[in-house]
C-alpha cells in the first residue's frame, strides 16, 4: 500500500509539475503509513514549490498537509480558510464533519 503510493507520487512529480492533485492519498493505509505519506506530500510540495490539491476525508491529513483548506459539499464550496481557523468556523456542515471525523476515532466501544 504505502510503497505503491510513494511510487505514484514519484511518477507524478518526475516532470516537475507546477500542480499536483492527490485523490484520497491515504485510502487503504494504516495510520502510521498515512502519516508518512502526509509528510511526504507536504515536504515535496515545499521542496518543488508546487501547488498541491488533496481530495480527502481524513481530518489528520487535512490538518497535516493543508495550508489553505476548502470544504466542498454537494459540489459547492461552503468554506475556505487555513488549518488554524477550521475549528472556529460558522459553517455547521463543516463542524459536523470535523466532529464526526475526529471524535469517532476517540471512542472505545465497551459493554
Question: Can you name each region flagged by the protein language model?
Answer:
Residues 87-111:
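C-terminal boundary and immediately downstream tail of ABC-type ATPase nucleotide-binding domains
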Residues 56-57:
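H-loop/switch region of ABC-family ATPase nucleotide-binding domains
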Residues 20-23:
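Catalytic Walker B motif of ABC-type/P-loop ATPase nucleotide-binding domains
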Residues 14-18:
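A short, proline-enriched helix->beta-strand linker immediately N-terminal to the Walker B motif
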Residues 31-33:
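Helix N-cap at the start of a conserved alpha-helix in ABC-type nucleotide-binding domains
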Residues 62-64:
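A short, surface-exposed alpha-helical micro-motif characterized by mixed small hydrophobic
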Amino acid at each position: 500500500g504505502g510503497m505503491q503510493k510513494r511510487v505514484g507520487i514519484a511518477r507524478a512529480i518526475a516532470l516537475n509539475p507546477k500542480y499536483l492533485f492527490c485523490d484520497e492519498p491515504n485510502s487503504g493505509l494504516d495510520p502510521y503509513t498515512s502519516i508518512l505519506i502526509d509528510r511526504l506530500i507536504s515536504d515535496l510540495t515545499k521542496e518543488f514549490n508546487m501547488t498541491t490539491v488533496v481530495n480527502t476525508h481524513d481530518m489528520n491529513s487535512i490538518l497535516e498537509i493543508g495550508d489553505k483548506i476548502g470544504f466542498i459539499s454537494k459540489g459547492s464550496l461552503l468554506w475556505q480558510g487555513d488549518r488554524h481557523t477550521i475549528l472556529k468556523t460558522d459553517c455547521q456542515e463543516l463542524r459536523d464533519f470535523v466532529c464526526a471525523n475526529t471524535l469517532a476515532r476517540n471512542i472505545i466501544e465497551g459493554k
